[in-house]
Amino acid sequence: MYLQELQLQQFRNYPTAKLTFGQGINVLLGENAQGKTNLLEAIYVLALTRSHRTANDHDLVNWQAKTAKVSGRVVKAAGAVPLELTFSRQGKRARVNHLEQARLSQYVGQLNVILFAPEDLAIVKGAPTVRRRFMDMEFGQMNPRYLYNLSQYRTLLKQRNRYLKDLQHKQNKDLLFLSVLSDQLAAFGAEIIAQRLAMLQKLEHWAQAIHGEISQQREELTFHYATQVADDQLTDVPTITAALSALYAKQQDKELYQGTTLVGPHRDDLHFQVNGKNVQTFGSQGQQRTTALSVKLAEIDLMKEETGEYPVLLLDDVLSELDDARQTHLLTAIQDKVQTFITTTSLSGITRQLIKDPTIFHVAEGTVVADAVDSDDPAASKED
């Protein structure tokens, strides 16, 4: 899978842009605040219908416009697929092969991307919400059923929390409807937990091999999914469902007092351990970075295993955060395998021997010009 072309209309600081990319490494070169990250964001949005930088879609629209459009052409083993997203005050519309999609969940998965930015180091050392979002975004791309379960769960969670708030102000509390919501939430929550466990087991397999190579077999990386459901109950969906229902009943008085749901996958966490110790708490900065790099590279192999296609890799100013050894491992791992987009202010910090025939894009004040350095790729012709 690779992104052949990208078109922008009134997206961020780009009134208009049309770019054709190489199948290998594409370097977005320019000073800070010129629009390099905006281009990566556009690719990310084209894949997932949402930004990794803002929760407000209005931020994506050029301040002089009312509507923004991101479109592209994705080439897969089965052929080329045109994609299009339109953002306006009325919401967003998604098209695949020029056909509007009734639900965004039907759209996600047409273009798979993996983003690695400096803030992704927070996967290891950040708050639990960062790791939950990581699981939801990545597993949702690979598995439409996961995305569906997550959507249903979030809808029910909002409804249940709203009802818990309402019950705080009532003398006679109708707990029957709360019980119905709890049962429904437990069912979808169990599906999510079971799917997370299955995907994490596969991701751990790939990450362990990569982490072992980087650490020269001195360290072993393991994952631990932290949930209030007891380990011996994490066997199958019905057992997890029953366990969640029991936890809701146990926590009912506390939830009524606080007016929020205290149990479920929205409260779970993922712990990374090196040689049996939690990297977040006891790991050095080097171990934390090696863990983050191992996990991101493992995503590439897992996505290929799950979807049959390699994803597009987005490296947003992350090479400057890696030492020479980790940078070498990263660039060697993706060479000739994954279409990659790299943002940087200078090529001097990149080991050029590890970048084969890159397509270079010069970015300045929302204008992009492409040329080639030692490349015969037709995508390297100059283009505004």
From Swiss-Prot:
Localization per record: Cytoplasm
Pfam entry (one): SMC_N
GO-annotated cellular components: cytoplasm
Domain of life the protein comes from: Bacteria
Biological-process GO terms, alphabetical: DNA replication; DNA synthesis involved in DNA repair; double-strand break repair; SOS response
Main location, first listed in the record: cytoplasm
Binding site for ATP: 30-37
Keywords, sorted A to Z: ATP-binding, Cytoplasm, DNA damage, DNA repair, DNA replication, DNA-binding, Nucleotide-binding, SOS response
PROSITE patterns for this protein: RECF_1 (PS00617), RECF_2 (PS00618)
CDD domains according to UniProt: ABC_RecF
Residues forming coiled coils: none
An example molecular function term from Gene Ontology annotations: single-stranded DNA binding
Function noted in UniProt: The RecF protein is involved in DNA metabolism; it is required for DNA replication and normal SOS inducibility. RecF binds preferentially to single-stranded, linear DNA. It also seems to bind ATP.
UniProt-listed PANTHER family: DNA REPLICATION AND REPAIR PROTEIN RECF (PTHR32182:SF0)
Family the UniProt entry places it in: Belongs to the RecF family.
Protein name (record): DNA replication and repair protein RecF
Gene source species: Levilactobacillus brevis (strain ATCC 367 / BCRC 12310 / CIP 105137 / JCM 1170 / LMG 11437 / NCIMB 947 / NCTC 947) (Lactobacillus brevis)
